[in-house]
């Protein structure tokens, strides 16, 4: 079995057709050259999950994983200026609507998988709270 990192596992759960539909509705990729909305989303998710503090951190982090970007649907790691420009100019409502679409999609998936369970044995809890003296 091949090793897949946590970031690519999370990205694989994203509903790409739903995202592409929103991109066509909003026309956010109309004038983009190489840095499309999907790459923007991947860049911002990478920023959140890796704890990046600056645009330079995002750009350098994605460049260090250049070989793995193809599996995420990203052709080329974005430059600092591209990330900065698209953060200012791209319509943020695309990502807001995609969040709610993804929330609905994932909620429907999890609703079917819920099972009731009962714990039959005693559960012992240990409180590790520190008390200052």
Feature map (PLM): residue ranges:
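Short alpha-helical elements
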Residues: 1-133
């Amino acid at each position: 079995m091949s090793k897949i990192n946590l970031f690519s596992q999370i990205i694989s759960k994203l509903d790409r057709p739903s995202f592409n539909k929103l991109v066509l509705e909003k026309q956010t990729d109309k004038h983009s050259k190489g840095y499309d909305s999907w790459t923007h989303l991947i860049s911002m998710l990478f920023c959140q999950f890796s704890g990046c503090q600056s645009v330079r951190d995002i750009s350098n982090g994605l460049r260090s994983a250049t070989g793995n970007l193809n599996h995420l649907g990203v052709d080329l790691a974005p430059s600092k200026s591209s990330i900065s420009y698209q953060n200012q100019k791209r319509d943020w409502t695309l990502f807001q609507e995609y969040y709610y679409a993804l929330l609905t999609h994932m909620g429907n998936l999890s609703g079917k998988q819920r099972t009731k369970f009962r714990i039959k044995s005693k559960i012992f809890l240990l409180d590790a709270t520190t008390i200052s003296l």
